[in-house]
Regions:
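Small/polar-residue-rich segments within soluble enzyme cores
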Residues: 38
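Short glycine/threonine-rich catalytic loop with a Thr-x-Gly-x-Asp
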Residues: 84
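Conserved C-terminal beta-signal and adjacent last beta-strands/turns
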Residues: 30-35, 94, 98, 102-104, ...
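Surface-exposed, extracytoplasmic segments of Gram-negative outer-membrane nutrient-acquisition systems
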Residues: 56-80, 110-155, 194-202
């Protein structure tokens, strides 16, 4: 399928919705192309499903915030045109060996990575373009030569914030007509931290390293 949607208001349509109505003029509709292929078996006592998916996100608008060197004033870094690839496989099984017992399990293995490098511009809390986040100097205009920007080299880096391996097992026993007892166990792995920006006072390029992976 193909989806085109407006970016989120905060950090997308608006540069900093908490303090200003200034519109992000570079924001465009975010696009996603996705397909899924699956196969399932269903018997009286057993259900098994295997799916593979691929999603390509295009023109995402994202933002990051931090404090300038004075540690009192907030800045926002706005990025547009960010792409990402999400792909993986998913397996589900439900078994009912007797009318009183239900067993279930699932496994999801994903590979989610940023798919390009992005250009970021900096703004202060009043949505004024910044020339330097060390001093807080304001640029002459949005997109002007002195408007602080840099290229964020993130192509191939894992997307953070969501576990890319998930597994679960569980069971349910029917003791009486209206009484069930059950237990579930869920396992999360390959969870990568989202990146944070160091105090940064100049333009040029910033190359991200592979984010920290939660043990």
């Amino acid at each position: 399928g193909y989806i085109s949607r407006a970016p989120f208001f905060s950090g997308g349509v608006f540069l900093m919705s908490q303090s200003s109505n200034e519109i992000n003029k570079d924001a465009v509709n975010e696009k996603a192309f996705s397909f899924e292929l699956g196969y399932g078996l269903r018997y009286k006592w057993l259900y098994v499903a295997l799916n593979a998916y691929f999603t390509k996100w295009m023109d995402k608008t994202t933002s990051k915030s931090g404090y300038m060197n004075n540690n009192t004033e907030l800045y926002t870094m706005s990025m547009t045109g960010v792409n990402a690839k999400h792909m993986g496989v998913e397996f589900d099984v439900v078994a009912r060996p007797t009318p009183y017992v239900t067993l279930k399990g699932m496994l999801s293995l994903g590979n989610w990575r940023w798919d390009n490098n992005a250009t970021a511009y900096f703004y202060n809390s009043a949505t004024q373009p910044l020339a330097n986040i060390t001093t807080g100097a304001v640029a002459s205009g949005v997109g002007a030569p002195d408007h602080l920007k840099f290229t964020l080299n993130q192509d191939g880096i894992h997307v953070g914030g969501s576990a890319q391996t998930t597994a679960a097992i569980g069971g349910d026993v029917k003791l009486l007509k209206m009484l069930h007892i059950g237990a579930d166990y869920t396992y999360y792995a390959r969870l990568y931290a989202d990146y944070s920006l160091p105090t940064y006072g100049g333009g040029g390029e910033l190359t991200l390293k592979e984010p920290w992976r939660v043990p």
